[in-house]
């Protein structure tokens, strides 16, 4: 009888758990933005004439005045 259990034991191998598939996100799962606060509008007059990019100082001043904070905006990442 022990020979039976020995043979059965060698055939039963623990199978690795299948990797969980990540659920694919589609448009129906995404809702409207929450807690959105419109701070400023950047118009064509705010664009730099030479490079076509916003002038960092002007945009930062507009945002600072709109949000009412005295936060110092970092100039480390200027577009």
Curated annotation (Swiss-Prot):
Region (Disordered): 41-79
Primary residence: cytoplasm
UniProt-listed GO biological process terms: regulation of cell shape; regulation of Rho protein signal transduction
Homology family: Belongs to the CDC42SE/SPEC family.
Ranges of compositional bias, category Basic and acidic residues: 63-72
Function in brief: Probably involved in the organization of the actin cytoskeleton by acting downstream of CDC42, inducing actin filament assembly.
Native organism taxonomy: Eukaryota, Metazoa, Chordata, Craniata, Vertebrata
Compartments where located: Cytoplasm, Cytoskeleton; Cell membrane
Membrane-related topology note: Lipid-anchor
GO cellular component: cytoplasm; cytoskeleton; plasma membrane
InterPro entries: CRIB_dom, CRIB_dom_sf, SPEC
UniProt organism field: Xenopus laevis
Lipidation (S-palmitoyl cysteine): 10-11
Protein name per Swiss-Prot or TrEMBL: CDC42 small effector protein 1-B
Domain named CRIB: residues: 30-43
Covalent S-S links between cysteines: none
Keywords associated with the record: Cell membrane, Cell shape, Cytoplasm, Cytoskeleton, Lipoprotein, Membrane, Palmitate
GO molecular function: small GTPase binding
């Amino acid at each position: 009888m022990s020979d039976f259990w020995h043979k059965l034991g060698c055939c039963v191998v623990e199978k690795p758990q299948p990797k969980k598939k990540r659920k694919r996100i589609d448009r129906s799962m995404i809702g409207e933005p929450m807690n959105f606060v419109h701070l400023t509008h950047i118009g064509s007059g705010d664009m730099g004439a030479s490079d076509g990019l916003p002038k960092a100082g002007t945009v930062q001043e507009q945002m600072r005045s709109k949000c009412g904070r005295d936060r110092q905006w970092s100039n480390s990442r200027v577009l």
